[in-house]
Swiss-Prot record:
The keyword Cytoplasm applies. It comes from Homo sapiens (Human). Possible role in spermatogenesis. This is Translin-associated factor X-interacting protein 1. Transmembrane segments: none annotated. InterPro entries: TSNAXIP1_N (IPR032755). One of its GO terms (cellular component) is cytoplasm. It is found in: Cytoplasm, Perinuclear region.
Amino acid sequence: MGGHLSPWPTYTSGQTILQNRKPCSDDYRKRVGSCQQHPFRTAKPQYLEELENYLRKELLLLDLGTDSTQELRLQPYREIFEFFIEDFKTYKPLLSSIKNAYEGMLAHQREKIRALEPLKAKLVTVNEDCNERILAMRAEEKYEISLLKKEKMNLLKLIDKKNEEKISLQSEVTKLRKNLAEEYLHYLSERDACKILIADLNELRYQREDMSLAQSPGIWGEDPVKLTLALKMTRQDLTRTQMELNNMKANFGDVVPRRDFEMQEKTNKDLQEQLDTLRASYEEVRKEHEILMQLHMSTLKERDQFFSELQEIQRTSTPRPDWTKCKDVVAGGPERWQMLAEGKNSDQLVDVLLEEIGSGLLREKDFFPGLGYGEAIPAFLRFDGLVENKKPSKKDVVNLLKDAWKERLAEEQKETFPDFFFNFLEHRFGPSDAMAWAYTIFENIKIFHSNEVMSQFYAVLMGKRSENVYVTQKETVAQLLKEMTNADSQNEGLLTMEQFNTVLKSTFPLKTEEQIQELMEAGGWHPSSSNADLLNYRSLFMEDEEGQSEPFVQKLWEQYMDEKDEYLQQLKQELGIELHEEVTLPKLRGGLMTIDPSLDKQTVNTYMSQAFQLPESEMPEEGDEKEEAVVEILQTALERLQVIDIRRVGPREPEPAS
């Protein structure tokens, strides 16, 4: 490609030079006409044709390949651009800077794509969690719908029963009203008969009196005036009595006997009460039915919404990975992968796979690039250049970290943990190999998050956790083993389940019954176990060659972390402020004393010193006015307290009953 260079289009006709002219002007039209009259006749140079043929051939070869990518398709263009740079010496600096700018941009885009890979994995995890939640919600919804259907059927049966009772009561009321009307007519007939009999009786009495007067005139003959007056008065009394009787008939003709009225009134009152009760029951059942129908409709609406969301997620989300594909890739084959994947969810399987990939990459690396001497670089990693990879086994790293912890605990003059770590490596391997071992150990503990010894050492080394947390946890485990040994009177390494339970409750008096039950299950207790069953308690504190503890000790650590989170959450709730708001030293101290009244002054000062990053000697005394000036964001204070060994000292005082 480096043959003779043609000067084209340097000496072509002047018409090839582009001029900035207004497109619609007269001058523009004249120039266009002139250009049409004198067309270009300059031929394409040989160098340009060779470059085009070369580019066409390379692109054709790439198109024939099955695995060509956009990165490979750029390679012919990059080579042609390099030919330009080499052949055109005058423009070489400018063309080189252009090439470097584009290469830098491509490298930046590659790094950006690589940085987005974890986000893709996170999206996969979120999708899996959403699928699980949707399945759980659908199962719960199905169960609730079945319960609502059963309850609806029961309510419908109850409504039918109440309707039947209502109909029967209505028929009974109708029958009673009919009987009442019949009785009324009967008594009305009797009243009329009595009136007729009374009239007949009066008529007979008058006739008898008249006959008596006619048969014995001598008796009354002595005083006829008197008799006439008496008869007149009697007839007046009769007339008055007859008028009163007529008034009484008019006023009380429709009146029934009080006894019958009271009996019918009582019956009517009872029926009315029953009717009111049935109406109230019916109204209550109707309202419950309406509420259930509303719940049913809202449930159907939520179901449709969740179903549409599920379809949208299934359409847009990444499918669930098939983890069985890893068994043929991971070192050790299907048996080792089955052992690694047992009892783990997708998120944990990702960590396992990353550890396997990371360990494989570590074994392939012979050197690590130095991180430099920046202030953000830990002191034990400050080095410029290549650092040898010592390639120790996982077991060797764990044993080395255990030795470091032993020496740290035996150290009298405490220095910072990173400085101690580097001094330990210098003393162990010499100054020449200390940096290589520091990089090697750091890369290993950064990868193996599932290993207890490595993950805890990494957290302490990077300042994410105080070393007192590790020390306190070891002391707790040692104290628990001592208590179990004291309870083992025969020194056989065996305890009954009852003794095991007693030791746990005496060692951890603040743990709930549920937490004690979890520890017993982690130790080997089953619901079918009896109090007399024996337990080999020493096996609970064993460790494998890689430093992994038994499930019992792991459960102790999990409960410790959960208790710490719950303790800090109670503190946040007691303070009653948001995470982004500021909290003063007196308020934080008061919140701690409220949720944990058994705290002593020294412990509280230690917590305050950590939360506000003040030496205990510089902290203001309790009640001092300077306390209000010490403030910190609540979230920052809680994160600092999360680092140290903070736990409940005594039970929280119960709130007074109202």
